[in-house]
Regions:
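Bacterial N-terminal signal peptides
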Residues: 11-20
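A structural boundary/capping signal
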Residues: 2, 22-216
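Bacterial N-terminal signal peptides that target proteins for export
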Residues: 1-12
């Protein structure tokens, strides 16, 4: 079973677990969230081990503004990422979203089993730049790019959705800007307001400080 199918099963299991623990009552009160769904928020990221692992590995990774191109092959990807981020750091926020989305979407889609011999592996941006990856890896690379550009944590979410057309799990990045929720999606060439997307049902979302579970 690939990640795209496993992601929905994980969310269902998580919902049952949270309900059994009463977390829905302890977490932030549910309100209307992404794609019109009701959302519940919590802050125990240890329940999202793959994402927590990415954050841990990121703390051990050189920041993109290290322009060295020596050592392992990934270092040159770091230098290229550095140059790209520096080229857009003074642009307005919408222009940054467009540039980051375009830059990362140029990489080919590659399943985890091809890259890593595993059905589910969450890459750091440096791993993505070196090997490319699947939908969640595009979203993570975009998330971290914007964080390095100075975007606050609370303006970004990595969102796992159910694609109602393909009947598969999918992952996107959502940015909150000027009262809008903008999707950065490797399956959609241009930025798009989530209000204009009707074939995604949100399942869960994470950033560095919180998780959200959605109910339609």
């Amino acid at each position: 079973m690939g990640w795209r199918a496993r992601s929905t099963l994980f969310a269902l299991a998580l919902a049952v677990c949270l309900a059994g623990l009463g977390v829905g009552r302890a977490a932030a009160a549910g309100g209307t969230g992404l794609f019109g769904a009701t959302e519940t928020r919590g802050d125990n990221l240890l329940m999202f081990g793959k994402w927590d692992g990415v954050l841990a590995r990121m703390r051990e990774t050189p920041e993109p503004f290290d322009d060295s191109c020596e050592g392992p092959g990934a270092r040159c990807h770091l230098k290229e990422w550095n140059a790209f981020l520096l080229s857009i750091k003074d642009k307005d926020k919408m222009a940054q979203l467009e540039a980051v989305n375009d830059y990362m979407n140029k990489f080919p889609y590659i399943e985890d089993v091809v890259n890593w011999g595993k059905e589910d592996y969450w890459e750091t941006p440096l791993e993505f730049l070196q090997f490319s990856g699947d939908c969640k890896d595009y979203a993570i690379a975009k998330y971290m790019s914007l964080r390095f550009l100075g975007w606050p944590i609370d303006e970004l979410r990595l969102v796992v959705v159910q694609d109602l057309n393909l009947h598969l799990g999918h992952a996107i990045l959502v940015a909150y800007i000027d009262g809008k929720t903008i999707a950065l999606d490797n399956q959609i060439k241009h930025l798009i307001n989530t209000q204009n997307i009707h074939h995604y049902r949100p399942v869960y979302a994470v950033n560095e400080s919180h998780w959200w579970l959605f109910r339609s």
